Amino acid sequence: MRIVINGFGRIGRLVLRQILKRNAPIEVVAINDLVSGDLLTYLFKYDSTHGSFASQATFSDGCLVVGERKIRFLAEKDVQKLPWKDLDVDVVVESTGLFVNKDDAAKHLDSGAKRVLITAPAKGDVPTFVMGVNHQKFDPANDVIISNASCTTNCLAPLAKVLLDNFGIEEGLMTTVHAATATQSVVDGPSRKDWRGGRGAFQNIIPASTGAAKAVGLCLPELKGKLTGMAFRVPVADVSVVDLTVKLSSATTYEAVCEAVKHAASTSMRNIMHYTEEAVVSSDFIGCEYSSVFDAQAGVALNDRFFKLIAWYDNEIGYATRIVDLLEYIQGNSK
């Protein structure tokens, strides 16, 4: 599979790290970003959260060079001028955060790419796939522009599926206590869209909106209209946690819920979910590749149908790992 990464920010860089780490059978032929290639190489090589890249990475002749791999840097703002046809691109990993609706993403197809994977919640009629939840429904003939949802949906949806399959869900409210991201301000500044979002990221707990819970309905249609939620942005650089307050359809115990999650984590959700009874905190999950880590000690039951459940996730590495998983799944099911 030949891919390009459009947008080499936090997610784009970590997707490449994960591809190289696992030596995935994916050839990254180009990176398109308006930042200079030498600076992008520096940002790829050194990461304040995840540490320095394990192998040597250098910038040479307009390329990022890692071992035997040479990845060409492009800096083209107009997507329709990108040479995807000449490069024989199978999939564009669209990680700018800008081309999230179908019409904009389709410009990559006009440039010659065969498929587009949006690494964010998509707008409009774009199929959403979450590994471990509904990825088997991917149709290579028709699903040309797809979304991998958000990091939070990738944490919540596997947990919701386990609950749905075992007990049924009547309704639920989710809060994600979410690490700061690059769109936030270090100190107070104007934010026209969200006034509170412009306040200093490392001085405040900031309430914010999120469509992550509603988006679960895109990959689990049975839950459409049954889940919603909000976010608190908090002063940590990485790792977030989902707090799901949920009313189940059938009576059960907290112990039975834990057992169902534990079983799924070792079978149908293996490598997607993890189960822990350890006394963990957020920094314990920096670099964690699971989508969702169920914290059995942190949850609580009000009665036999009403529960508060807690799941951790590295909102950067965990999500980037699922993107690579989805790319490999597409590769294996597009022949």
UniProtKB/Swiss-Prot annotation:
GO cellular component term of the entry, any: cytoplasm
Q: Under which EC number(s) is this enzyme classified?
A: 1.2.1.12
Q: Which residues bind D-glyceraldehyde 3-phosphate?
A: 150-152, 181, 210-211, 233
In which pathway is this protein known to take part?
Answer: Carbohydrate degradation; glycolysis; pyruvate from D-glyceraldehyde 3-phosphate: step 1/5
Give compartment(s): Cytoplasm
Q: Which UniProt keywords apply?
A: Cytoplasm, Glycolysis, NAD, Nucleotide-binding, Oxidoreductase
GO terms in the biological process aspect are:
glucose metabolic process; glycolytic process
List the GO molecular function terms. glyceraldehyde-3-phosphate dehydrogenase (NAD+) (phosphorylating) activity; NAD binding; NADP binding
Residues the UniProt record annotates as site (Activates thiol group during catalysis)? 178
**PROSITE patterns, sorted:** GAPDH (PS00071)
| Catalysis performed (reactions) | D-glyceraldehyde 3-phosphate + phosphate + NAD(+) = (2R)-3-phospho-glyceroyl phosphate + NADH + H(+)
Residue sites binding NAD(+) per the record: 10-11, 33, 77, 119, 315
Is Iron one of the keywords UniProt gives this record?
no
- Subunit structure, interactors included: Homotetramer.
**Function statement:** Catalyzes the oxidative phosphorylation of glyceraldehyde 3-phosphate (G3P) to 1,3-bisphosphoglycerate (BPG) using the cofactor NAD. The first reaction step involves the formation of a hemiacetal intermediate between G3P and a cysteine residue, and this hemiacetal intermediate is then oxidized to a thioester, with concomitant reduction of NAD to NADH. The reduced NADH is then exchanged with the second NAD, and the thioester is attacked by a nucleophilic inorganic phosphate to produce BPG.
Protein name per the record: Glyceraldehyde-3-phosphate dehydrogenase
